[in-house]
Amino acid sequence: LMEEVLRLEHTGVLGKPFFISALKEQVMKIQARALGESGLPETEDNVSLEGLRFLAAEDNEINAEILTEILSIEGASCVIAENGKQVLERFKESEEGEFDAILMDVQMPVMNGYDATRAIRTLARGDAGRIPIIAMTANAFAEDEKEALSAGMNVHLAKPIDVGMLKQVIREYVLIKNHAE
């Protein structure tokens, strides 16, 4: 029986009170470290974002600057929109495939992230239904994650964003998808 048990030598840390999304993030990190190399393009620890292009919805100027700087350091570029309506318009104006993913805040003026995601998913263009949309929000309860997924977002990340977790999500939803195509 002991031979059949996968021993997880790595641990994660959660503070109290903790949210389901934070628990899920820690479990995913532990699993990724325990399973190691899976034959996919790169591992979580050395994911390269070099050359990736992101469209990001972020109404907080400081958060937008931090996100842009993080992505720039990783070799990626980012176009910032201040609300959901601007993201929708910028995506409509873009060439198909211009962006590798959309990083979507949820609480924004003019149009929220849920409505923007629903609108993007209904556009009559080939990439509208398949571009990864990653929720990046302070809304960290299980019902917030459920609402993000039902709006058409691929995954929900709670703020403050952990760079390692963001890279893992990008690996899973952007790099592996591109590798498979």
Regions flagged by a language model, labelled:
Residues 1-181:
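C-terminal compact regulatory domains
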